[in-house]
Amino acid sequence: MQSPIVITGMGTVSPLGCGVKAGWERLLTGHSGISLITRFDTGDLPVKVAGSVPGIDEDPAAGFDPNRVAVAKERRKLELFSLYALAAAEEALTQANWYPTSDADRQATATIVGSGIGGFPTITQAQNTLSTRGHRRLSPFTVPAFLANLAAGNVSIRYGLRGPLGCPVTACAAGLQAIGDGMRLIRNGETDVAIVGGAEACIDPLSLASFHAMKALSTEQEDPASASRPFDRARDGFVMGEGAGILVIETLAHAEARGATPLAILSGYGTSADAHHITAGPEDGRGAAEAMRTALRMARLAPDAINHINAHATSTQVGDRAEIAALRNTFGDALAGIPISATKSATGHLLGAAGGVESIFSALSVMHNRLPPTQNLKDVDQGLDDLDFVSGAARDYPTQHVLCNGFGFGGVNAALIISKI
């Protein structure tokens, strides 16, 4: 019998702060990481709010301090999404106590960190420099800063990890697909340990304006904390977030052999394509349902064995409806008895980093038997009254298996099942 694949380390940078402990505690207590944008002047942009990672000055307890991640000279070469990935990787590797020094261990450690957009702000800044100051003023680090695979590359370089290196660039499913890719590499015997997850940082004027042109973003301004409202009748779009979620995964046998503590089991994974539309999934959610069914088959679980669902739930009208259709397609009548959380209500949508961060939230639910609340769910959308949304406050709940979903543009779907040790 194959040894199960387990999580031995976790690290997060999110709008709820830096570090798994701070982010989890704030999520459970109903803290919102969504606020007015102060990083730049939003001018006449109708989008004024985002899930920004707090800086150390505004959040001394859990703010992001780039000086702790890299010295000033090194930071010139790094886009923000890479800095977030490095910070989250350090936390995860420390918890896992995995700092390989032998050639064999370094070659047996994969680094798979997804990103939907990569260093998009660097591209817009470079274009501005080119237009106003000429090509001679462009930084030689422009290209290596913005390439999406450089989050994975920088983690690999820093820790000398010489195993497989990869970066799913699959929009909002990238983080979950990175985890799935790492699971496959371990199961196929290509690597013993994998550093997996996602990183994203694209809160800038062009990104916001472009997503707004698609009518995808919330335009709430008066009460930023209420802007992300998954499954609520009044939802008006997603809130852009940023951050990174990184996990260390390996087989249980490998973890026990080196004295590591397993935190949770990655018991099932599935991915699929809608083959339908570049930005919208089919109304019946058939592609997403297929990813969930594949994950259930891998985990050898019946649908009613799932105790909790961490929904993708971005707070768009079309997306939330399609996900519920997919869940009904997958779980049938059992869905009414499964509590559902939508953590993007607290963080906004971290795009390619969402799967990394939300898989960690899912693992914590399994570990602590605690379900995070869905914020801002005041008026449940039509046709959803039969479902059990965790709202208002966190819930104590016996949790053996959690399903975590991630879907993205292009019709990509991913589903991950995390189980108790």
Where are these regions (language model features)?
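Conserved small-residue
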Residues: G9, L27, A89, T111, ...
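Active-site pocket-shaping loop/turn-to-helix segments
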Residues: P15-A22, V69-E90, L138-L147, L165-G180, ...
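Condensing-enzyme catalytic core mediating Claisen C-C bond formation in acyl metabolism
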Residues: P4-T8, S35-L36, P46, E222-A299, ...
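Conserved beta-ketoacyl condensing-enzyme motif
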Residues: I7, L28-T170, A199-L208, P303-G319
